[in-house]
């Protein structure tokens, strides 16, 4: 029921309307014309106030415990997801900060162009909450402008790939590093005249030949840089060819064929990556020498061709490990298809089995031996505990390395693997020498022609303990950020996995033992 004041106002309004209707047509026209003029003036004033002072609403501030999102500039979710993943790797952000400092110091004169390293560092520090900002959404268009300067063409109307952008960034950073002045050749008289005179004690030697190639410190320190080792062994004489090392910035793993009812794990992909293959019709110098020794009167012996076994391993593991799961396949008709199989992965990754070791080389025995039970916690730098393993452990020593992707029963169902080696449900991480921790996961939703990239990443550490690692996970889709659980992360169909190396319990005890000596 209306109050007495409301009823009085309604009665007065009805009387005013009746008086207006009883007036003549000319009077009503003048009144309505004046109202139109007044309304137009009010609208103009409102528009002017909006232009000068902006909207009256306040800017939304970021909620506590979350990170800034990134605005989608038009099919730029691939870039936003990769930036969120890189910002969750503290070792890469720290290296990039040191790299930009050294690059700025080594450059002669002012910068004539915008540097990729400085632009990338500013974005990653803002996304990892290392810079003071309360904005909920950031703009990464500056990175696109810099990449176009590096002659990387990108269209807002085409779908792009996050893994391709990862290699564009790493190669562009390498090009930026190569711009620094190198050792001047003695025949380059013009450059020598421009250099300042050196003190006598700085001159160590002179040479007539070309200078020896110097090692690139950038490559040796880059956190994503690793080396693959490959060697070939003759099946006939068992002669081993020299080991060859090739560099990599990410491991691109193909997904093996799945068996119905059996889950695929990250170990299956890694084992398929390093599995040996036979190479036929290869000239073996050792077999040729053996055959030549058995001949008489120095008869010429043809080159002996045999079958070699090629073995691939990881010669050097990086500090930050990027794993790319190849989800592109081709049908029998030649059309591209996306593989949607779920590949199980763990929060911790053991790479001991896939590491290349020299013949006769044994792991270091310094420090006390591990006396903990299989359920001992990880001795990582932030004292975070590792998952507790189960009661049973595999008896064979080699089986302990195939543990990546066998999650806890509370997270994922433990089913028998389609390969010959067993996968324990809960591995023992305490004795691993090459242990990595999951930092971010990039997921692609959709098919090969269209889709969307999202990222799962760890929340930045608190200001009170900046060296720690947060257990809180975040789900990020461009400018949308929310909290997520570890179970949701491990259940996702990963496209890119970002791991960072940590110390196991045995390594931590060995470091403490050596410091006490």
Curated annotation (Swiss-Prot):
Q: Which Pfam families match?
A: UCH (PF00443)
Q: Where is this cross-link: Glycyl lysine isopeptide (Lys-Gly) (interchain with G-Cter in ubiquitin)?
A: 235, 289
Where is each USP domain found?
68-502
For molecular function, the Gene Ontology terms on record are: cysteine-type deubiquitinase activity; cysteine-type endopeptidase activity
The record's region (Disordered) falls at 364-395
Topological domains on the Mitochondrial intermembrane side lie at 1-35
* CDD domains xref list: Peptidase_C19F
Q: What are the GO cellular component annotations?
A: cytosol; mitochondrial outer membrane; mitochondrion; nucleus
Keywords annotated in UniProt: Hydrolase, Isopeptide bond, Membrane, Mitochondrion, Mitochondrion outer membrane, Protease, Thiol protease, Transmembrane, Transmembrane helix, Ubl conjugation, Ubl conjugation pathway
Q: Which reaction does it catalyse?
A: Thiol-dependent hydrolysis of ester, thioester, amide, peptide and isopeptide bonds formed by the C-terminal Gly of ubiquitin (a 76-residue protein attached to proteins as an intracellular targeting signal)
Report the active site residues: 77 (nucleophile), 452 (proton acceptor)
Q: What does this protein do?
A: Deubiquitinating enzyme tethered to the mitochondrial outer membrane that acts as a key inhibitor of mitophagy by counteracting the action of parkin (PRKN): hydrolyzes ubiquitin attached by parkin on target proteins, such as RHOT1/MIRO1 and TOMM20, thereby blocking parkin's ability to drive mitophagy. Preferentially cleaves 'Lys-6'- and 'Lys-11'-linked polyubiquitin chains, 2 types of linkage that participate in mitophagic signaling. Does not cleave efficiently polyubiquitin phosphorylated at 'Ser-65'.
Q: What is this protein called?
A: Ubiquitin carboxyl-terminal hydrolase 30
Source species taxonomy: Eukaryota, Metazoa, Chordata, Craniata, Vertebrata
